[in-house]
Amino acid sequence: MGKVRSIDLLGFLCPIPVHETRRVLQDSEDGEVIEVVCDDPETLHDIPALCDRMGVILEKVEEKDGEFRFLIANVTGELQY
């Protein structure tokens, strides 16, 4: 696993978590892993859809006590916008 960058989006409702995740991914480097922590249940659909659109790998989704943790890998550095 490459360098991990965490973004805390607890308390924000969609579309903010998706926009912030996209912004961080666009700024990410080849091999970097982005950890997104949020509590909006809509992100369970929206973040995986964003990963599909951008061509990145959603490595893991975890839920604990109403919080969701996504691990997203930019494996190529060549994102689709």
Segments (PLM) and residue ranges:
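Right-handed parallel beta-helix/beta-solenoid
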Residues: 1-8
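Intrinsic-disorder/low-complexity, polar/charged segments enriched in Ser/Thr/Lys/Arg/Asp/Glu/Gln
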Residues: 4, 31-35, 67-69
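Amphipathic, hydrophobic secondary-structure cores in small proteins
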Residues: 9-61
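C-terminal structural segments of small proteins and small subunits
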Residues: 50-81
